[in-house]
């Protein structure tokens, strides 16, 4: 079983990877766009749903709040969908004889790596949320147990002061 620190470390590494993929995708997209303008061919495929996913991943690893985890999961799903669409669009237009073939191949490779990263990040976010839920439940249970012990201790302290006691509505009251 992974600890919270290991999950957070893995999320940070994957988030940095996603940011790197996003920046690389933007660079490949910019080069591809400029070459497409020269050749008067349409440029398909977006660069970077992964950049946003990586930034949200770092925020999620730092904050660990429920809303940030939901935001990160949503970004991972959007990155996953964007990566799949990007791959499908590029696969449809890629011709091995095209001068843009190496750039399309690079974009498709980045999309595949990004899709894998988004999938693993989503899974790790679910693991982190589950771990945090168990931790909060354990803390709440410990707090309730501690407050119950303190109430029992207070009751026994009141009973042991030597004066006759009465129980009224769950409270110990002295008769004198």
From Swiss-Prot:
Membrane topology (UniProt): Multi-pass membrane protein
GO biological process, one term: positive regulation of apoptotic process
Membrane-crossing residue ranges in chain numbering: 11-31, 41-61, 67-87, 100-120
InterPro entries: TMEM196 (IPR037661)
The UniProt record lists the keyword Transmembrane helix: yes
A GO cellular component annotation in the UniProt record: cytoplasm
Keywords, alphabetical: Cytoplasm, Membrane, Transmembrane, Transmembrane helix, Tumor suppressor
Subcellular location: Cytoplasm; Membrane
Alphabetical list of PANTHER family matching this protein: TRANSMEMBRANE PROTEIN 196
Biological function: Acts as a tumor suppressor in lung cancer. Inhibits tumor cell growth by inhibiting cell proliferation and migration and promoting cell apoptosis. Inhibits metastasis of lung cancer by suppressing beta-catenin expression in the Wnt/beta-catenin signaling pathway.
Official protein name in the record: Transmembrane protein 196
